[in-house]
């Protein structure tokens, strides 16, 4: 590993030789000199860098490499105005690979999938070939995919041949006439026929332009974020500007009027007189509901305390062991209920106003004359790991719902993390990008909801309701047919890849055998053994995981891969035409940026499962698009409400939104049986607990459907965070707080410390925190600035000026993608704080809860966004065994949290006490399983022994029991009232609480203790996702009985209680002096336990009617036999034989 540190100081190398031997990975690391070039069909190497990398990177102090591009007669630097137009086309058509001790390669792919693609943004899109003899390179194209032809004779020519022609006299190879214009930028702009964009700042490198937004904020504006400063007046009464895209008033004071002064002009007084409208509102629970709710909690706490005191004082001398066990369990249950109930004291609801969002960010204003979207960028993360358990069709539908979301196209980017590195997932994403060419414009034209094609075409409601366009029926029929063909292509991909690989493998074997025979003449030739590779559609080896795993091509050992499936869209709307199958006139046909990412995996490096994959996406997206906000989805969760992203952005862009670390959306599920047998909807958690936490510091992070602030993931403190420096005891021996000299507006970029040196974040330590990528480090202040709310009101602190985000997005170049390859390599996180303080936190099965806890612990807040129409929907395991394993994984993560430093006992003073109790309950709840199992056996032990937990059922005990039960029911009814759930959902949750508590939670505690005490690591298999292919029976998985050891405790509890009831009845009936009170008490509690386990018993029976009758007969006979045998062995007092006085009371 000695070469590792040396290699970390250099960026990955880039070349386009895709046929080089893969053994190069084992060679010594390359030098720090990196060449960015590609080879043309004529053998020339052409520079394709968009900026002068030497000048750009040389200005950074932390740079440990240099870039050398030696000029030759055939390789002269190209004019930036020409190269920028073609650079993204090259990037989107190239597959970038690289990693540890390997060269970063850009493999130019003329074909990504077997089918033809036509969208100009897509990789491998079909186009015309160069007409110059001996050249087959694609012709340059514009945003619409139309050919860029520099000569009036329309001779088709590629970029390289055009540059050759310009250098050799400027003559067109077709008509032999000189080119009238040799600048591609000019005729490209004429071909687009779009409005001119706001110009970038004059001069400066790409890095200067990238950081100029942040530089512009180092002005008096940032030092004046106080309530006494009028931002509107400063902006419109001075000639100064901050940020890009701002406008100031003309001398006549009118804006928006025509040349004659007529029109609806608006002056600064008109703007300042308009009332400021918030983006969100907090809706308090009615006092008629919440006040009795809190009063009942107080009453129940008092009654529980009195009851436990009475139970401790009044022992049962006849069965002291039974009394002791019951009291210990009741004490724990009281503590567990208290930890669960206290955080529910302050539930709230929230509402958003999308009209205000549109008015503030997408309406023409003096600071945004063109009305371009001023919303911040948003990077969407979709994670998948195994195409066998997570069907590619499900993942493709999720991608399509994201691409069709109602959010500015140029501000949206989608990153797909394929942690398995499978070619099947890669080609499925390419097929989805191709189908999006039709699906996304169709959704925009007809306002389709939901925008997941599989869910939309499976709707059981009338699809033509509220549709007024005459061509909707024709369009829907056409798109439905295309989607059916798309599904067939996706389903046939595994066989297609296998057949293709077999064909190429056979060809390679034949070539090798011919070569071997030629070299050895007539000698006996041994069979040639060639590794069976997986081949891509363009006839090259897949750099990821092969179907038949081999060295450097397995799930845990493969190179990093990045493919830009859809290149970034143009800044201006691109309207379709009436030609083709759909009339897309006045419909924007642009598609968001879509990137396939598979991080590098190598033996000896811990991959950290999903958390590691998410952190790799965070770094790659920071370099490629750097959206200040991130929303992550599991591959089986899709956008059900196309405006959900806007609703989440309302919270982030509202006043005080800069202190929000994330917006959590509730999880809603499809494909669950109508009775919700195993409480898959989990509505008590998502609609009761999460709403209650929203009234504190915010809900916990649940792993999917969460909108993050990027800098919160980076481990920064929130703006205006209160600093605490507790000593041994913060109450008595606290140290004095230093007075910070760091400006208030810059505190969001601090990671602790108060000195002037800390204001610069100790630049020498930055690589130790984030790694050695200067691109990544430079993107941090840009993301922080762009994520601020608008400074459109004096009360808005730490805001940004309106119109600052209307500038065009920078184009992707190969050097940027190469840097992204470097940051997803297996070695990048070595000796950094990724996973410990930055990004998703490692070390727990439930990395989501720990990640959210760390943010709240630093003082950030979160909000819960419940939309009228579900924001996201997904699938959940409806099979009993799968559900228990899911609960086991969650509970194991909680046990890990309890035994780690993430225990809420060690939370910082920034966390509120009730929020701390909520996180403490997250770590403690699995331990209830021990007491729950004991308590479930107590009724049976009572019936077996003829004793009860109390000596007699006196009035005091019954009154306490009645009050506790009534308060519990009333609290449940009030929770149902303010949360909106149903009584059946509440009861299903209670049932599964006992089922999970007696099975999965017990196993989780045992596994957690084994990990802590013995160091035994815990591994879980990926939960299989349903592909929705079983049309005949949607709930077929519900009836499948798959045995697991988790079923043993609940089955034992049921059997013991059933036998105990039979024994109790037999004992009482044959007793000389029947004690019916003890029997009734024991039978009542046994039936209460069995009622909770009813869904579990129903799941064991499988499909209704399929359980043989003989099973019930034998079960009854066994129960009767055991009960009679017990009575014979231990006869009732006063009876000498079975029989005797058989009398009813």
Swiss-Prot record:
The active site is at 419, 848. One of its GO terms (biological process) is cell wall organization. It comes from Arabidopsis thaliana (Mouse-ear cress). The chain crosses the membrane at residues 289-309, 319-339, 930-950, 956-976, 1002-1022, 1045-1065, 1079-1099, 1109-1129. Pfam families: Cellulose_synt, zf-RING_4. InterPro entries: Cellulose_synth, Nucleotide-diphossugar_trans, Znf_RING/FYVE/PHD. It is found in: Golgi apparatus membrane. It is a multi-pass membrane protein. PANTHER family: X-BOX TRANSCRIPTION FACTOR-RELATED. Its EC number is 2.4.1.-. Keywords: Cell wall biogenesis/degradation, Glycosyltransferase, Golgi apparatus, Membrane, Phosphoprotein, Transferase, Transmembrane, Transmembrane helix. The modification Phosphoserine is found at residue 755. This is Cellulose synthase-like protein D3. Thought to be a Golgi-localized beta-glycan synthase that polymerize the backbones of noncellulosic polysaccharides (hemicelluloses) of plant cell wall. Required for synthesis of a cell wall polysaccharide essential for root hair elongation, but not initiation. May be the functional ortholog of rice CSLD1. Preferentially expressed in root hair cells. Expressed in roots, leaves, stems, flowers and siliques. It is an enzyme of class 2 (transferase). Belongs to the glycosyltransferase 2 family. Plant cellulose synthase-like D subfamily.
């Amino acid at each position: 590993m000695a070469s590792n540190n040396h290699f970390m100081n250099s960026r990955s190398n880039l070349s386009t030789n895709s046929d080089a031997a893969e053994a190069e990975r084992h060679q010594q690391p390359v030098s720090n000199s990196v060449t960015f070039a590609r080879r043309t069909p004529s053998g020339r190497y052409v520079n394709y860098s968009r900026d002068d990398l030497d000048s750009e990177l040389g200005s950074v102090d932390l740079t440990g490499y240099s870039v050398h591009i030696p000029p030759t007669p055939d390789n002269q630097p190209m004019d930036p105005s020409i190269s920028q137009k073609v650079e993204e086309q090259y990037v989107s058509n190239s597959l970038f690979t690289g990693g540890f001790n390997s060269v970063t390669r850009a493999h130019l792919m003329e074909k990504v999938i077997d089918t033809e693609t036509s969208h100009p943004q897509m990789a491998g899109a079909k186009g015309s070939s160069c007409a110059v003899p001996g050249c087959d390179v694609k012709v340059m194209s514009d945003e619409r995919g139309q050919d860029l032809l520099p000569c009036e004779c329309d001779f088709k020519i590629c970029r390289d041949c055009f540059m050759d022609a310009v250098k050799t006299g400027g003559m067109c190879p077709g008509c032999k006439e000189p080119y009238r214009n040799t600048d591609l930028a000019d005729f490209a702009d004429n071909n687009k026929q779009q409005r001119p964009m706001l110009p970038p700042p004059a001069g400066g490198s790409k890095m200067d332009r990238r950081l100029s937004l942040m530089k512009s904020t180092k002005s008096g504006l940032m030092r004046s974020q106080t309530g006494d400063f009028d931002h509107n007046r400063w902006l419109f009464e001075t000639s100064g500007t901050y940020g890009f895209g701002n406008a100031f008033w003309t001398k006549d004071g009118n804006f928006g009027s025509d040349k004659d002064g007529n029109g609806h002009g608006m002056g600064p007084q008109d703007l300042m007189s308009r009332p400021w409208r918030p983006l969100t509102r907090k809706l308090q629970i009615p006092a008629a509901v919440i006040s009795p709710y809190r009063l009942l909690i107080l009453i129940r706490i008092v009654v529980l305390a009195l009851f436990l005191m009475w139970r401790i004082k009044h022992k049962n001398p006849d069965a002291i062991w039974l009394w002791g066990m019951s009291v210990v369990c009741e004490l724990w249950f009281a503590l567990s209920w208290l930890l669960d109930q206290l955080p529910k004291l302050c539930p709230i609801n929230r509402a958003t106003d999308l009209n205000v969002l549109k008015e503030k960010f997408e309406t023409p204003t003096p600071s945004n004359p063109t009305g371009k979207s001023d919303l911040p960028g948003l990077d969407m993360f979709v994670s998948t790991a195994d195409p066998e358990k997570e069907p590619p069709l499900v993942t493709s539908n999720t991608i399509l719902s994201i691409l069709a979301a109602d959010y500015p196209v140029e501000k949206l980017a989608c990153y797909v993390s394929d942690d398995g590195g499978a070619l099947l997932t890669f080609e499925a994403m390419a097929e989805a990008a191709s189908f999006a060419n039709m699906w996304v414009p169709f959704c925009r034209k007809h306002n389709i909801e939901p925008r997941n094609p599989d869910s939309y075409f499976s709707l059981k409601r009338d699809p033509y309701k509220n549709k007024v366009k005459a061509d909707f029926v024709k369009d829907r029929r056409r798109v439905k047919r295309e989607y059916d063909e798309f599904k067939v292509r996706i389903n046939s991909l595994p066989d297609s890849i296998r057949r293709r690989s077999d064909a190429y493998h056979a060809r390679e074997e034949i070539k090798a055998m011919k070569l071997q025979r030629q070299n050895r003449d007539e000698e006996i030739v041994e069979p040639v053994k060639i590794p069976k590779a997986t081949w891509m559609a363009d006839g090259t080896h897949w750099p990821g995981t092969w179907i038949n795993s081999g060295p450097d091509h397995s799930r845990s050992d493969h190179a990093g891969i990045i493919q830009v499936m859809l290149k970034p869209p143009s800044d201006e709307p691109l309207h379709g035409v009436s030609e083709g199958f759909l009339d897309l006139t006045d419909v924007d046909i642009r598609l968001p940026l879509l990137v396939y990412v598979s991080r590098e995996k190598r033996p000896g490096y811990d991959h950290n499962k999903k958390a590691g994959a998410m952190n790799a996406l965070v770094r790659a997206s920071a370099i490629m698009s750097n959206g200040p906000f991130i929303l992550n989805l599991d591959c089986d969760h899709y956008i059900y409400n196309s405006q959900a992203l806007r609703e989440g952005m309302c919270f982030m862009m509202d006043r005080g939104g800069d202190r929000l670390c994330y917006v959590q959306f509730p999880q809603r599920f499809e494909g669950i049986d109508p009775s919700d047998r195993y409480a898959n909807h989990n509505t008590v958690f998502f609609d009761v607990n999460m709403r209650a936490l929203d009234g504190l510091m915010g809900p916990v992070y649940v792993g999917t459907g969460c909108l993050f602030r990027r800098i919160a993931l980076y481990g920064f403190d929130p703006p205006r965070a209160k600093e605490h420096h507790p000593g041994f005891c913060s109450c008595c021996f606290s140290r004095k707080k230093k007075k910070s000299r760091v400006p208030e507006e810059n505190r969001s970029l601090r990671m602790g410390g108060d000195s002037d040196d800390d204001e610069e974040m100790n630049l020498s330590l930055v690589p130790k925190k984030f790694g050695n990528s200067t691109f990544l480090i430079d993107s941090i202040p840009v993301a922080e600035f762009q994520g601020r709310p608008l400074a459109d009101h004096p009360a808005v602190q730490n805001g940004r000026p309106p119109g600052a985000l209307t500038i065009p997005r920078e184009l992707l170049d190969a050097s940027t993608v190469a840097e992204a390859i470097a940051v997803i390599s297996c070695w990048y996180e070595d000796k950094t704080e990724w996973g410990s303080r930055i990004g998703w936190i490692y070390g727990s099965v439930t990395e989501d809860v720990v990640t959210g806890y760390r943010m709240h612990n630093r003082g950030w807040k979160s909000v819960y966004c419940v939309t009228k129409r579900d924001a996201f929907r997904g699938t959940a395991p409806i099979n009993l065994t799968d559900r228990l394993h899911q609960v086991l994984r969650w509970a194991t993560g909680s046990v890990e949290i309890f035994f780690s430093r993430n225990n809420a006992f060690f939370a910082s003073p920034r966390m509120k006490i009730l929020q701390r109790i909520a996180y403490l309950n997250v770590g403690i709840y699995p331990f209830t399983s021990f007491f729950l199992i004991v308590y479930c056996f107590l009724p049976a032990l009572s019936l077996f022994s003829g004793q009860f937990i109390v000596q007699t059922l006196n009035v005091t005990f019954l009154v306490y029991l009645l009050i506790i039960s009534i308060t519990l029911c009333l609290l449940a009814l009030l929770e149902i009232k303010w949360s909106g759930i149903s009584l059946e959902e509440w009861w299903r949750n209670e049932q599964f609480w006992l089922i999970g508590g007696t099975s999965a939670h017990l196993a989780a505690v045992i596994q957690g203790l084994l990990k802590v005490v013995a160091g035994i690591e815990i591994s879980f298999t990926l939960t299989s996702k349903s592909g929705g292919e079983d049309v005949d029976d949607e709930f077929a998985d519900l009836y499948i009985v798959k045995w697991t050891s988790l079923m043993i405790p609940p089955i034992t509890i049921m059997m013991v209680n059933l036998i105990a009831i039979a024994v109790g009845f037999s004992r009482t009936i044959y007793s000389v002096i029947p004690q019916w009170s003890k029997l009734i008490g024991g039978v009542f509690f046994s039936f209460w336990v069995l009622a909770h386990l009813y869904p579990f018993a129903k799941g064991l029976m499988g499909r209704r009617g399929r359980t043989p009758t003989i099973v019930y007969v034998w079960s009854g006979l066994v129960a009767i036999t055991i009960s009679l045998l017990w009575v014979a062995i231990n006869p009732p007092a006063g009876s000498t034989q079975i029989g005797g006085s058989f009398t009813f009371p």
